[in-house]
Amino acid sequence: KSVAKYGPPVYVRHEIVHYKYVVDSLKNIGAIFVEELDEIEDKSRPVIFSAHGVPKIVPTAAINYKMEYIDATCPLVSKVHREAENLHKANYHILLIGHLNHPEVIGTMGQLPNGSIDLIQTVKDVEEYKNRNEKKIAYITQTTLSVDDTKNIVDALKMKFPDIREPVK
């Protein structure tokens, strides 16, 4: 819809979804995929943020560049971002179950100040995690991981931290 509204090219920060057919279709109608905003030569063109979400600094950078942006963050990802913010405001330290360098993890971790969220990828990470005297700990998960993908990690977290706060359903 953005290409129809604005005409090509429309820039997209990261592949908007992990689905080659969709990405190729968008390229064919004038979408140009970039990793960072500074790769966009014509800042008068709009940019779309992918369904995975982006760190808070990205919309700020777009505003500073005077770029129009469209936030296509998946509603489920936005829910995780809001939950992270609410937990942070309630003085929880947050553990994010996810995969290092996944765009969604980067976006979620970028919602809060550095050090507010620690990434947990494996049961071994749980075993090695040192609680830095946080009074309250909560966990959230990357939305693209299934309950089966995270079950062993969640079980390990609950064993290590019996009072850990679970995500809002």
What is each of the regions a protein language model found here?
Residues 1-169:
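The feature marks the mature, well-folded catalytic cores of soluble enzymes
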